[in-house]
A protein has these predicted regions:
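Extracytoplasmic metal-acquisition and chelation regions
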Residues: 1-237
């Protein structure tokens, strides 16, 4: 990682405490003063992690699992690159505009799928606080988060508390993480009977130029399907 870092001119980070480890690598390089760091979340509106079972007030770093915040990030990166490389400023901005247009269409298409369902109260819990920004695109607030923090195991008391919240709040859907086997979600499903759906965290796998579009569309499609199914159960079609 240090060798690869030494070959960079620019480093783009998410920030907000999500990728602090990268600065240890940066500080270990010979060229740390020469590498420009771009903070993708500069001026992006942040949300606190909703539904924390321990009532912790922490800003949510998962802005990249969304459309609205990701578009802001794209423009931030393009602007910063244009300042570093003025000769190609218009090239970066055009790419940003074209990409933002693609992302906005994905959001529009998803919202059009559920717009005729009317004002329905879809109640959601999540495995961790990774999906607040994505769900907010649909006007959905997260009522409960199972893990105290991403990857942290909830205690028996935490599980008891979240099961009570899910029952009291009449939660319709639990969103877990795709390709992540979590026994706590299974336990909660057995205790509450609430359906579990899976979303991508988009932090692994091979790099592909259109990878973000593919994964975010999969997530949008999964949320749309969950909303439709919940609406059908509530008698709205």
């Amino acid at each position: 990682d240090i060798k690869r870092m030494n070959e960079l001119d620019v480093l783009v980070v998410n920030g907000i405490g999500h990728d602090e480890f990268i600065f240890d690598i940066l500080n270990a390089t010979d060229r740390k003063k020469d590498i420009k760091v771009i903070y993708a979340n500069k001026n992006v509106s942040l949300m606190p992690i909703a539904g924390s079972i321990r009532n912790e007030k922490v800003m949510n770093p998962h802005t990249f699992i969304s459309i609205t915040a990701s578009v802001q990030q794209v423009y931030n990166i393009a602007k910063e690159l244009g300042e570093l490389d003025p000769a190609n400023k218009e090239f970066y901005l055009k790419n940003a505009r074209d990409y933002a247009k693609k992302l906005r269409k994905l959001k529009t298409d998803a919202l059009n799928e559920v717009k005729n369902l009317g004002n329905i109260d879809i109640r959601v819990a999540t495995l961790h606080g990774g999906y607040d920004y994505l769900l907010s695109e649909f006007g959905i607030d997260v009522k409960a988060v199972i893990e105290p923090s991403h990857g942290a195991q909830p205690s028996a008391a935490d599980l008891e508390k979240v099961i009570k919240i899910i029952k009291d709040q009449k939660i319709d859907i639990i969103f877990g993480e795709k390709n992540f086997n979590n026994k706590f979600v299974d336990t909660i499903h057995k205790e509450t009977g609430v359906e579990v759906r899976s979303l991508s965290h988009m932090t692994n796998g091979a790099y592909e130029a259109d990878g973000f579009e593919k994964f975010i569309k999969m997530d949008l499609d999964e949320v749309v399907k969950a909303i439709k199914d919940a609406a059908a159960k509530k008698g709205k079609k």
